[in-house]
Amino acid sequence: MLFIFNFLFSPLPTPALICLLTFGTAIFLWLINRPQPVLPLIDLDNQSVGIEGGARRGAFQKNNDLILYYFSDAKTLYENFQRGLAVSDNGPCLGYRKPNQPYKWISYKQVSDRAEYLGSCLLHKGYKSSQDQFVGIFAQNRPEWVISELACYTYSMVAVPLYDTLGTEAIIFVINRADIPVVICDTPQKATMLVENVEKGLTPGLKTIILMDPFDDDLMKRGEKCGVEMLSLHDAENIGKENFKKPVPPKPEDLSVICFTSGTTGDPKGAMLTHENVVSNMAAFLKFLEPIFQPTSDDVTISYLPLAHMFERLVQGILFSCGGKIGFFQGDIRLLPDDMKALKPTVFPTVPRLLNRVYDKVQNEAKTPLKKFLLNLAIISKFNEVKNGIIRRDSLWDKLVFSKIQGSLGGKVRLMITGAAPISTPVLTFFRAAMGCWVFEAYGQTECTGGCSITSPGDWTAGHVGTPVACNFVKLEDVADMNYFSVNNEGEICIKGNNVFKGYLKDPEKTQEVLDKDGWLHTGDIGRWLPNGTLKIVDRKKNIFKLAQGEYIAPEKIENVYSRSRPVLQVFVHGESLRSFLIGVVVPDPDSLPSFAAKIGVKGSFEELCKNQCVKEAILEDLQKIGKEGGLKSFEQVKSIFVHPEPFTIENGLLTPTLKAKRVELAKFFQTQIKSLYESIEE
């Protein structure tokens, strides 16, 4: 006892005292600098709230009032950009770069001025500041795309994005359906295609083409011969500068853009979106982000997702409202990592297809058992921090394992949002662990301006798309023939709110199919409310689905084309939202297969021919040939097939009484073969 007393109260030697003070200081510094967890803002077990009529709203909303705008001085997309000009103090706005060079920036005022000059040129040429004045924009992402779009908004015109994957026939349809007299495009190749359509009498209403890139006199002369005026964007801006017209700003209820969906069957449909639609959707995401992430003029995003789709334009609109910067990629997705390293974005909108590539590359580089062990340990350790609300990129695991991944995306990403297609749980979990930033999954479609739900801060579970955003409600409606009922918290996802579109351009029948008399948008997706109030996508009402890259697939259309193949009796086309390509199951025609096989030098019984690899390859080649002749796009073609000797019948449960394919049953029946086909092809 005396020893303990003497030890505690006798003077300490100087070295011991220094060590004790040093240790105490280290503990104190760790306590005040240790990462602070971000606590969930809502009860994660009750993330949405039921309201009258069976719909639900996000629990973070205080009441049932849906948001219209976030900033009182930005109720239209024109005002939204002007606000960015003011709060950034005319800071850098749009950035671009050439290979191996730094980004160059165009200021907010320069963008605004150029938009006014371009719009003034259009007015000088006789086009109107009007809700039925449609202007086509046919270009890859670049600063001039935004300038052209802003020119439309500045003078109350309506932008109509066009894009390559629509195909020539669809572009002709869009130009005629929207009565587009002027198209602003980037390359002479696209302009040539537009002129050829006029020469053939296919788009007689097209009168003006404004080109961003240089073009030769021959193209100008071809245009003159068929009544199309060819102008360079530079000349158009000079004409507008010399004949300046005062801006004619739009009202919130005015149309801002017509987004034509590529569609899977029939002609494209033009979704009519107002300024209010877009601004309210932007406001909902700003409100959602408010407690954890408030964009400023210091924030920058990289523009590489197609501007023809609303996801990219929503992100840009949010950045513009806060005076942020948009840096454009060079136009080659293979150079995206180099662009990101040069730009160092803080906001990164993305899609599962790109994240899958990064994830696969990281997994493939961990070749030895030790590297795999360390990678998995790092993911588990970092994700445990994430689950506890700690978001950082300065841990030991970041320095040892994840710094290279973070660096490949610029090293400064603060916010990632993935959308357009479902993302797998392992990939989403990996990026939440590896990036040290906020990573959310969003869900929506063009008809609701892009987004209607998003995962909540603090909820790091995967396999769902979160809760309704602040501009809309969501409800599930019975789909009796598929055995989905709202009393079971299942049904077709329906959306109502300020972001729901006004209908399809000049197509009341298609509009009535998706927009009911009470204003509910019927998405065609089947959803399920999970016990915690989040929404999970479980099916499609129609046999249409998305591939991993976001392309819509109508399998029945493809099957109808493939049925023209001589050796084919029946065909089942299968795809999955986490896969980037299609596979198929083919039942050959017993009468045609022997002669078909004989032409490639193969003989045998029907069963032997079905198992023969050469026959399989020949059938696949014939399918792809028929598909190309039938107008199928490359992503609509099957990459591999399984040849099955037994036909699909009512008796074996693979056909309905009306002889339609039972797709769910077929997928289950051939699940082993489907898995094998996917595994045999490296995506």
Curated annotation (Swiss-Prot):
<dbReference type="GO" id="GO:0005524">
    <property type="term" value="F:ATP binding"/>
</dbReference>
<dbReference type="GO" id="GO:0047676">
    <property type="term" value="F:arachidonate-CoA ligase activity"/>
</dbReference>
<dbReference type="GO" id="GO:0005739">
    <property type="term" value="C:mitochondrion"/>
</dbReference>
<dbReference type="InterPro" id="IPR042099">
    <property type="entry name" value="ANL_N_sf"/>
</dbReference>
<dbReference type="GO" id="GO:0090434">
    <property type="term" value="F:oleoyl-CoA ligase activity"/>
</dbReference>
<keyword id="KW-0276">Fatty acid metabolism</keyword>
<feature type="modified residue" description="N6-acetyllysine">
    <location>
        <position position="361"/>
    </location>
</feature>
<dbReference type="GO" id="GO:0005654">
    <property type="term" value="C:nucleoplasm"/>
</dbReference>
<keyword id="KW-0067">ATP-binding</keyword>
<keyword id="KW-0256">Endoplasmic reticulum</keyword>
<feature type="transmembrane region" description="Helical; Signal-anchor for type III membrane protein">
    <location>
        <begin position="12"/>
        <end position="32"/>
    </location>
</feature>
<comment type="similarity">
    <text>Belongs to the ATP-dependent AMP-binding enzyme family.</text>
</comment>
<keyword id="KW-1000">Mitochondrion outer membrane</keyword>
<keyword id="KW-1003">Cell membrane</keyword>
<dbReference type="GO" id="GO:0005783">
    <property type="term" value="C:endoplasmic reticulum"/>
</dbReference>
<feature type="topological domain" description="Cytoplasmic">
    <location>
        <begin position="33"/>
        <end position="683"/>
    </location>
</feature>
<dbReference type="InterPro" id="IPR020845">
    <property type="entry name" value="AMP-binding_CS"/>
</dbReference>
<dbReference type="GO" id="GO:0001676">
    <property type="term" value="P:long-chain fatty acid metabolic process"/>
</dbReference>
<keyword id="KW-0812">Transmembrane</keyword>
<keyword id="KW-0735">Signal-anchor</keyword>
<keyword id="KW-1133">Transmembrane helix</keyword>
<dbReference type="GO" id="GO:0004467">
    <property type="term" value="F:long-chain fatty acid-CoA ligase activity"/>
</dbReference>
<dbReference type="GO" id="GO:0005886">
    <property type="term" value="C:plasma membrane"/>
</dbReference>
<keyword id="KW-0436">Ligase</keyword>
<keyword id="KW-0007">Acetylation</keyword>
<dbReference type="GO" id="GO:0005789">
    <property type="term" value="C:endoplasmic reticulum membrane"/>
</dbReference>
<protein>
    <recommendedName>
        <fullName>Long-chain-fatty-acid--CoA ligase 5</fullName>
        <ecNumber>6.2.1.3</ecNumber>
        <ecNumber>6.2.1.15</ecNumber>
    </recommendedName>
</protein>
<dbReference type="GO" id="GO:0005743">
    <property type="term" value="C:mitochondrial inner membrane"/>
</dbReference>
<dbReference type="GO" id="GO:0005730">
    <property type="term" value="C:nucleolus"/>
</dbReference>
<dbReference type="GO" id="GO:0005741">
    <property type="term" value="C:mitochondrial outer membrane"/>
</dbReference>
<comment type="function">
    <text>Catalyzes the conversion of long-chain fatty acids to their active form acyl-CoAs for both synthesis of cellular lipids, and degradation via beta-oxidation. ACSL5 may activate fatty acids from exogenous sources for the synthesis of triacylglycerol destined for intracellular storage. It was suggested that it may also stimulate fatty acid oxidation. At the villus tip of the crypt-villus axis of the small intestine may sensitize epithelial cells to apoptosis specifically triggered by the death ligand TRAIL. May have a role in the survival of glioma cells.</text>
</comment>
<keyword id="KW-0496">Mitochondrion</keyword>
<keyword id="KW-0547">Nucleotide-binding</keyword>
<keyword id="KW-0472">Membrane</keyword>
<keyword id="KW-0460">Magnesium</keyword>
<dbReference type="InterPro" id="IPR045311">
    <property type="entry name" value="LC-FACS_euk"/>
</dbReference>
<keyword id="KW-0443">Lipid metabolism</keyword>
<dbReference type="InterPro" id="IPR000873">
    <property type="entry name" value="AMP-dep_synth/lig_dom"/>
</dbReference>
<dbReference type="Pfam" id="PF00501">
    <property type="entry name" value="AMP-binding"/>
</dbReference>
